[in-house]
């Protein structure tokens, strides 16, 4: 969400950023709606003040037995009621349109973010690790994780497809244990060494939680909802069914006919569906949603910041915009585990906290001795709510390229405004918007893929990184032949 006052003061600056996201003219539209809203509010307030004044004068006129004046004033009050109703309607309309517009507009990038249209505009910041020193680095044609998983008998995409469809997997045996070990290792690292507080949050959230972090309303198609109902499609079906049973209704008694008509009425069905939707939830696409919303509508003391939270949870994504991409294997799944990092801090500390978060994510890859590079994303490749984002990309030998494994973003006060999350400075009464940051520390499934591929040897064994061996009961390798 954006500060309309800031947009009003410098619309060209905002429009310059939004035009690159296909929203040219959005700033001018926001200013126009804001002007309509304020004009309606002024009209309403003036009419209310005039009505109150006239109401007092009516009493005075009646006390003086001046019936003509009292009648004139009463007519004036009645007229003002119409003005107030019109102004209130205009206020509600402009307010709703302005809120909808602001909710649909992405965050403004930080000045140091490079301009660009897509991933080709991202800037590499650094690289770490040497893939040739790992077991897979000695192979001419390293296998991908799908073939490795099949050889180990621990990765079954067909069984998952039979029960859930595409983009799911059943992990078994040593691979399932390795996945669990990776998640526990990451969580211990972030809590014990990096000082994050472990949280076990809800996996189901309401609309307002996803609105707060920016997934709704724009990205509903990428989410899984527990309840779905299309009222428009229902209306068409209702009309067809009502026509078909119309003649049958005439044969019922008046009492039964009226009861049945009500139960079949659009008003009743709409009310019932709305009630169901209000009770519905969404599966979280990332624990960022649950962790960040902990401070929703809260006023936090400055002494409590930075607040660093982490959670190991499943994440659920519909991947609506990913048709045809990464259809093989575990790179892009509807359900996957991830260790999420969230920081709540002050504006003056958010940049330093961002750099720290990136280092916390990088440490996971360093301890696993997985080669990676860190990228600063350009304006066209950043997410909706981010003002600055770093991606970590891990080396996958089967693809001979780096692939994203973590994304760490500073959202500034963008999410805080949507959630009304504030902090209070020492000695002050008022509140200031917090800054929120989030990142993966890391995606467990993609880390599993990277370990399998980078630590395979010519005999088909998977060597277990030293950092994971304590979580695997001391096992040093799985599968294959010595």
From Swiss-Prot:
Catalytic activity: tRNA(Ser) + L-serine + ATP = L-seryl-tRNA(Ser) + AMP + diphosphate + H(+); tRNA(Sec) + L-serine + ATP = L-seryl-tRNA(Sec) + AMP + diphosphate + H(+)
This enzyme's EC code(s): 6.1.1.11
Region (Disordered): 1-26
Key words, A-Z: Aminoacyl-tRNA synthetase, ATP-binding, Cytoplasm, Ligase, Nucleotide-binding, Protein biosynthesis
Enzyme class per UniProt: ligase
GO process terms (BP): selenocysteine biosynthetic process; seryl-tRNA aminoacylation
Gene Ontology CC entries for this record: cytoplasm
InterPro entries: aa-tRNA-synt_IIb, aa-tRNA-synth_II, aa-tRNA-synth_II/BPL/LPL, Ser-tRNA-ligase_type_1, Ser-tRNA-synth_1_N, SerRS_1_N_sf, SerRS_core, tRNA-bd_arm
Subunit note: Homodimer. The tRNA molecule binds across the dimer.
Family named by the database record: Belongs to the class-II aminoacyl-tRNA synthetase family. Type-1 seryl-tRNA synthetase subfamily.
Record's protein name: Serine--tRNA ligase
Organism: Caulobacter vibrioides (strain NA1000 / CB15N) (Caulobacter crescentus)
């Amino acid at each position: 969400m954006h500060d309309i006052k800031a947009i009003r003061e410098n619309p060209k600056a905002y429009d310059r950023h939004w035009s690159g996201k296909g929203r040219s003219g959005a700033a001018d539209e926001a200013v126009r709606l804001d002007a309509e809203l304020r004009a309606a509010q002024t009209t309403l307030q003036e009419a209310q003040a005039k009505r109150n004044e006239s109401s007092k004068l009516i009493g005075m006129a009646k006390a003086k037995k001046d019936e003509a004046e009292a009648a004139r004033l009463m007519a004036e009050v009645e007229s003002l009621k119409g003005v107030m109703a019109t102004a209130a309607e205009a206020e509600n309309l402009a307010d709703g349109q302005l809120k909808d517009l602001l909710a649909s507009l992405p965050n403004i990038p930080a000045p140091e973010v490079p301009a660009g249209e897509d991933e080709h505009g991202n800037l590499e910041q650094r690289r770490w690790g040497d893939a040739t020193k790992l077991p897979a680095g000695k192979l001419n044609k390293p296998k991908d994780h799908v073939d490795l998983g099949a050889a180990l008998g621990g990765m079954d995409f067909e069984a998952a497809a039979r029960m859930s469809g595409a983009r799911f997997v059943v992990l078994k045996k040593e691979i399932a244990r390795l996945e669990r070990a990776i998640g526990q290792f990451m969580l211990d690292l972030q809590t014990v060494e990096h000082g994050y507080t472990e949280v076990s949050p809800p996996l189901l959230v309401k609309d307002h939680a996803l609105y707060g972090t920016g997934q709704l309303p724009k990205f509903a198609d990428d989410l899984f909802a527990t309840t779905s109902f299309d009222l428009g499609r229902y209306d068409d079906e209702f009309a067809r069914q009502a026509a078909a049973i119309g003649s049958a209704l005439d044969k019922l008694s008046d009492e039964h006919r009226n009861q049945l008509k009500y139960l079949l009425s659009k008003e009743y069905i709409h009310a019932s569906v709305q009630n169901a939707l209000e009770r519905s939830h969404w599966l979280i696409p990332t624990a960022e949603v649950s962790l960040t919303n902990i401070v929703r509508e809260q006023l936090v003391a400055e002494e409590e910041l930075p607040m660093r939270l982490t959670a190991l949870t499943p994440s659920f994504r519909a991947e609506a915009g990913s048709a045809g991409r990464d259809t093989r294997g575990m790179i892009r799944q509807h359900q996957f585990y991830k260790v999420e990092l969230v920081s709540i801090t002050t504006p003056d500390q958010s940049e330093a906290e961002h750099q720290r978060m990136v280092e916390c994510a990088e440490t996971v890859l360093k301890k696993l001795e997985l080669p990676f590079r860190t990228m600063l994303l350009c304006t066209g490749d950043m997410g909706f709510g981010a003002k600055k984002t770093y991606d970590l990309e891990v080396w996958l030998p089967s693809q001979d390229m780096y692939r994203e494994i973590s994304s760490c973003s500073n959202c500034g006060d963008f999410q805080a405004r949507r959630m009304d999350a504030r902090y209070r400075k020492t000695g002050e009464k008022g509140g200031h918007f917090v800054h929120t940051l989030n990142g993966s520390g890391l995606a467990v499934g993609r880390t599993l893929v990277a370990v399998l591929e980078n630590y395979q040897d010519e005999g088909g064994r998977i060597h277990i990184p030293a950092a994971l061996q304590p979580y695997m009961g001391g096992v040093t390798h799985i599968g294959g032949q010595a």
